[in-house]
Amino acid sequence: GSTPDTINYVKDYLFIISLFNIFFIVSYSLEVIVKADGFPILATVGVIISAITNIFLDYIFVIKFGYGVKGAAFATGIAQVLSTIFFLSHFLRKKSNLKLVKFKFDFKTIGKIISLGFPDCTSELSVGLVTILFNQSLMRFIGQDALISYSVICYINTLVSMTMVGITQGVQPLISFNFGARENENVNNLFKIGIKTMFITAITVFELCLLFANNITALFIDTKEVQLFNSTVYVFKLYSFSFLFLGFNLIISGFFVAIDKPICSAIISLGRSLVLVIISLFVLTKLFGGD
């Protein structure tokens, strides 16, 4: 999905960031396990440490030392290393309920883990494929400025979707616990609470995006770039309507995982993040082109 102008930057960034892949995977996994261990605040602290470290090192490597894209990649990778160490240290403390111990491979358990994790896995993998397809379509029908607008929307979408993922992950273990205890009434009540919370979040995010579209866009694009700025604001406002529905897909998919129905969850995840997106992309570009 890169262009001739950005290909070298992409190569540099991907090469360096790939050196830290294991830390991205382990850090994210441990964050979820720490929450499951009953320490959600600690998990939040770990994420904040990673974010602050990333910002600080970006300033040092990119601005002070002038390392450019390579510096940004190293900053992100090192932040994940520190996050991984922080989360690992939790399981070495006495207060943790879960401990690091020797284990034997139980393929039945591993199969269960894979089946329950498959819906989220497909969603994550779909992001890369969809991004490539969108980049190619934007370059074909509009041009490089469209990639800038799309990048801005992707940043905002990530922030919004992660907020909604947080709500989903917050209610999932509670639903799973009550489902295992056969407390069906509690399961239904928790699901309703999750839906209501997601509804309030969706409405709030949508209204904020519409009201402050100009201000948010100005964080990424110089207002002096009038045409690019205005087109990004326009597209951003249109895209904001998707936030009204995004959270419900996430929480319903997460609910099915929590009650041990991964196939239903996988169907929703694949439809939301890949199948329907690709179909819509091809159909709408055929009908409307760059519009």
Residue ranges and their predicted role:
Residues 32, 58, 62, 87-91, ...:
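Structural signal for membrane-spanning alpha-helices in multi-pass inner-membrane proteins
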